[in-house]
């Protein structure tokens, strides 16, 4: 196996999945390192996408070619337009998703993306050389090298 990539993304949450997908779509040989492939883009106890603030972010991600909105459409179990009693400028779409389906759909997207590879293991440390990040070392000592490392280690670290 070749352990050299253009970009390594550490963390398989929402940001990590979007970053890895975008990098690979732009032609970079990309590695996504995650602690658990069955929990890619895991949603919190309130599995909602959209709403007043988050809805704006989802629309911006969508405009940039991201997949969060599409994955939401594939895994949604209920949809509601918030603030319908106010003017149209205040309306805000929100979807409740099936938590497992959301993660499964993200995995399908990532596994079907060319130039994107997924490695399940804990990232332990950055490899530094010549005052520059050169890669990532995992908990079992596997060393991956790259031109850039994106850290999206998020909040679900337990």
Per-region residue spans from a language model:
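Beta1/beta-strand and adjacent pyrophosphate-binding region of the FAD-binding site
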Residues: 2-15
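Beta-sheet entry/capping signal
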Residues: 7, 29-31, 147-149
């Amino acid at each position: 196996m070749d352990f050299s990539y253009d970009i390594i993304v550490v963390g398989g949450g929402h940001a990590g999945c979007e970053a890895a997908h975008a990098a690979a779509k732009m032609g970079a040989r990309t590695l996504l390192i995650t602690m658990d492939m069955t929990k890619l883009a895991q949603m919190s106890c309130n599995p909602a996408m959209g709403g007043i603030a988050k809805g704006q972010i989802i629309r911006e991600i969508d405009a940039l070619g991201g997949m969060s909105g599409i994955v939401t459409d594939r895994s949604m179990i209920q949809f509601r337009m918030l603030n319908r009693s106010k003017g149209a400028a205040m309306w805000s779409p929100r979807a409740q998703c099936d938590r497992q389906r959301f993660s499964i759909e993200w995995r399908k997207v990532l596994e079907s993306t060319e130039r994107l590879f997924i490695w399940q293991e804990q990232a332990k440390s950055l490899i530094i050389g010549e005052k520059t990040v050169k890669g990532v070392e995992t908990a079992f000592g596997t060393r991956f090298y790259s031109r850039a490392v994106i850290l999206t280690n998020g909040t679900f670290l337990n």
